[in-house]
Amino acid sequence: MNTISIVKILNEFDQLQNTEITLYGWIRTRRHSKTKITFLNLYDGSCLESLQIVVKNNLHNYETDILKLTTGCSIIAKGYITNSLGTKQRIELIATYIQVLGWIDNPSTYPITTKKHSMEYLRNVAHLRPRTHIFGAISRIRHVLFQSIHNLMNTKGFIWVPTPIITASDTEGNSKMFYVSELLNNSKKSQNICNSHQKIPELFFGKEAFLTVSGQLNVESYACALTKVYTFGPTFRAEHSNTNRHLAEFWMLEPEMAFTDLNIIIKIADSLLKDIVQTILEQCINDIEYCASHIKEYNLIKRLENFLHSKIIHIEYTDAIKLLSSCDKTFNNTIYWGMDLFSEHEKYLSEEYFQSPIVIKNHPKNIKAFYMRLNDDNKTVSSMDILVPGIGEIIGGSQREERLSILDKRLLENNLKTECYWWYRDLRRYGTVPHSGFGLGFERLIIYITGLTNIRDAVPFPRTINSINF
């Protein structure tokens, strides 16, 4: 049976007018008129819009089925597409056949009603929230973002590399990682991430293994052979952070490029962000407008358009600290050189002071990862954080340390064992090259594009501390 989606009906109405079609979907609303005609509002998730189906009482199951339909019921409908006689919709389907595929058990307790539900309420029914307008819009935006990133990276000459989800290495150094080794008694657990070469028979891999916090170290090995590569997949952090900015499981885009320095990757990151925003404004404008209206972020589209035409402002970390220390604003967290900036500082700089995307460069080495290239002052590393109005940091990156002796020193300074990173050190022993990369948090990007205020709404099934219900 040939079926057609609502988005195709809307886009190809001129060709489909007065032709019989078949479509599937779910009932959003049902309205019965005094003229014994029922109007069904049908959606199938292919677009924001629904399709009105006009059902006359001459259908054989009009009394037994049609008049009993409630929000959420699934149906198959056949009929003719025509111009609507009403003013609230452009087209409608005159039904010739309707079959109910699935009823709603006890409609009075169905969690998704026609009223507007709060985002907090919908998090408790994450398995049903895709049926709402807002999460349908977010899902389509996420899909286009995912596809556009792969397309853009391919166009820019990058090769995709799938990096492992299970790893023996800690990319960030001393990160809180999830164990995926088989369970051991506490007395048998190793105290260090790096085990000796002696295998532990109780462990599946013969040594401790973890869920990855980043694919960067692995993808660096491919950058040192293929020049321009990227990985894009799930990452995991076992941090005890119960905020609207943190997830235990999230996705990261991580490009890595050989023969590049910090300034080059800043340009690449800025260009990529603008290309992504441009694509989403072209392909998902209806869904973005709905998000802006639903969340009451009425300046969302203007903010995205302003970003497209903005020039990123560069500022040294040291200068950013001086600026924050001398400004009139009172912060909850004390400002001092050597601190990691908090969200309140990032938002002040990007939203209030500069009112523009900014990149903060050359952070103190003590607050950054071991793999970042040490600057000549021996105090800072060649790092960068891109901040945008609305959310603060959206990209973090650096030039990588390509000098083996300095890398070894940085590992020791971070209390990491060089033997744990033997293969990573090999990249510096065999034809080392300057190389750089960055990470773009996918859910952070979704928040920026949609105007969402809680990152738990940017992922289908959020994983956070003390919460894994689905």
Swiss-Prot record:
As for subcellular location, the record says:
Cytoplasm
Q: Which PANTHER family match?
A: ASPARAGINE--TRNA LIGASE, MITOCHONDRIAL-RELATED, ASPARTYL/LYSYL-TRNA SYNTHETASE
Catalytic reactions of this protein: tRNA(Asn) + L-asparagine + ATP = L-asparaginyl-tRNA(Asn) + AMP + diphosphate + H(+)
Question: Where does this chain mainly localize?
Answer: cytoplasm
Q: How does it assemble?
A: Homodimer.
Q: Which GO terms describe its cellular component?
A: cytoplasm
- What name goes with this protein? Asparagine--tRNA ligase
Q: Which Pfam families match?
A: tRNA-synt_2, tRNA_anti-codon
HAMAP family named in the record: Asn_tRNA_synth
| Top-level lineage group | Bacteria
Task: Tell me which EC number(s) this protein carries.
Answer: 6.1.1.22
Naturally occurring in which organism (per UniProt): Blochmanniella floridana
> So what family is this one in?
Belongs to the class-II aminoacyl-tRNA synthetase family.
Say if the entry is tagged with keyword Cytoplasm: yes
Q: One GO BP annotation here?
A: asparaginyl-tRNA aminoacylation
Q: Which UniProt keywords apply?
A: Aminoacyl-tRNA synthetase, ATP-binding, Cytoplasm, Ligase, Nucleotide-binding, Protein biosynthesis
Q: Which PROSITE patterns match?
A: AA_TRNA_LIGASE_II
* InterPro entries named in the record: Aa-tRNA-synt_II (IPR004364), aa-tRNA-synth_II (IPR006195), aa-tRNA-synth_II/BPL/LPL (IPR045864), Asn-tRNA-ligase (IPR004522), Asp/Asn-tRNA-synth_IIb (IPR002312), NA-bd_OB-fold (IPR012340), NA-bd_OB_tRNA (IPR004365)
MF-aspect GO terms: asparagine-tRNA ligase activity; ATP binding; nucleic acid binding
NCBIfam families hit by this protein: asnS, PRK03932.1
Among CDD domains, the record links this protein to:
AsxRS_core, EcAsnRS_like_N
Q: Does the keyword Protein biosynthesis apply?
A: yes
Question: What enzyme category does the UniProt record give?
Answer: ligase
Q: Which gene encodes it?
A: asnS
